[in-house]
Amino acid sequence: MTDSALSLLGLALRGGSLAVGEEPVREACKTRRAALVLTAADAAPGSADRARRWAQERGVPWVRLPWDKETLGGALGRSLCALAALTDRGLAAAVAAKLVRADEDLRPALVSLLNEKKNPRAKQKPAVPET
């Protein structure tokens, strides 16, 4: 399951829906584009704390991933990656679902995205009635 989550992160990067690195993640949170903030298992404590704080300030789910910086970076075509933020809500929900399937302990942190995945129309605007 987690390998497919890594694949989705690579797809998000290629599609321009993944902010990678401390400054891009901070900016994605600040501009309210971040849908899910991720930190590598071995991210520096200060970096992980900042990412968590940025996410919490904006009500964005945050999770520490089961992969180290090298594994996460390798999936993204980089040598290392400690912080990332998905900016596409659909991809964020898909990654959240895969992470929870692999580790049920992540469910509380990702419940808002999992609920969106179950009911994708809940966030859509209602149809305008014809007149």
Annotate each predicted stretch with a short phrase:
Residues 23, 42-43, 67-70, 89:
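Short, ordered loop/turn segments at secondary-structure junctions
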Residues 8, 20, 97, 128-131:
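Long, amphipathic alpha-helical "stalk/connector" segments that mediate intersubunit docking
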